[in-house]
């Protein structure tokens, strides 16, 4: 017989197990629904991440081309001096949000694109090519932060999907079948005991009737 639980083969245990099977099957159904919903959410975000990554690659290319043109116009040494004098960006704030019980990051990205006057370098010593390059890299930074949020969300959702899948499989292939096998075993055991009791009572009745007829 397949593997069973170590319980006493009594009617009380039989009733308990039947209740446990119902609860386990309900839990399995809910977990399966959660798993399916998580997978749908994962692929929705995955498509978004792919689109953002393609856009980021494009923007990085544009930014480095703008940087090359700025170098040609003002020279590498002057460009480095300008870069050192740039004001730092605003700080980002990382919070979290809930997606079907999974905590994922929520990054509050401030407006990173700035006016030339907000960057901190003197107009007289720079050029429009430098402004364009700075703007392009600000766009890259903003998109990279958004992509980091999305990819971390994917990572956490993926872990939760695997965790939920293991629980679904454990219930479906181990726990519920084991309980059902145990129920079957107890029912067979109780039926056998009833048959033995029936034949025992029948023999006792026959003996009593034989004595009365003597």
UniProtKB/Swiss-Prot annotation:
GO molecular function: ATP binding; proton-transporting ATP synthase activity, rotational mechanism; proton-transporting ATPase activity, rotational mechanism
Keyword Nucleus: no
Subcellular location: Cell membrane
GO biological process: proton motive force-driven plasma membrane ATP synthesis
Keywords noted in UniProt: ATP synthesis, Cell membrane, Hydrogen ion transport, Ion transport, Membrane, Transport
InterPro entries listed in its UniProt record: V_ATPase_D
GO annotation, cellular component aspect: plasma membrane
Pfam family, one: ATP-synt_D
Bilayer topology annotation: Peripheral membrane protein
Subunit details: Has multiple subunits with at least A(3), B(3), C, D, E, F, H, I and proteolipid K(x).
Family as reported in the entry's similarity comment: Belongs to the V-ATPase D subunit family.
Task of the protein: Component of the A-type ATP synthase that produces ATP from ADP in the presence of a proton gradient across the membrane.
Protein name from the UniProt record: A-type ATP synthase subunit D
């Amino acid at each position: 017989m397949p593997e069973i639980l170590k319980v006493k083969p009594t009617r009380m245990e039989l009733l308990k197990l039947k209740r446990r099977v119902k609860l386990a099957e309900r839990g399995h159904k809910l977990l399966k629904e959660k798993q399916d919903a998580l997978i749908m959410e994962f692929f929705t975000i995955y498509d978004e991440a792919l689109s953002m990554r393609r856009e980021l690659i494009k923007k990085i290319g544009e930014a480095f081309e703008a940087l090359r043109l700025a170098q040609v116009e003002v020279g590498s040494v002057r460009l480095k001096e300008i870069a050192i004098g740039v004001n730092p960006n605003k700080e980002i704030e990382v919070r979290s949000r809930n997606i079907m019980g999974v905590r994922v990051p929520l990054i509050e990205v401030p407006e990173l694109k700035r006016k030339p006057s907000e960057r901190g370098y003197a107009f007289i010593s720079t050029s429009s090519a430098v402004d364009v390059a700075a703007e392009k890299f600000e766009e890259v930074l903003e998109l990279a932060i958004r992509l980091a949020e999305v990819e971390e969300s994917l990572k956490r959702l993926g872990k939760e999907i695997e965790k939920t899948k293991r629980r679904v499989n454990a219930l479906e292939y181990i726990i519920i079948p084991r309980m059902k096998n145990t129920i079957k075993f107890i029912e067979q055991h109780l039926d056998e005991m009833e048959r033995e009791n029936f034949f025992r009572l029948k023999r006792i009745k026959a003996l009593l009737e034989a004595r009365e007829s003597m």
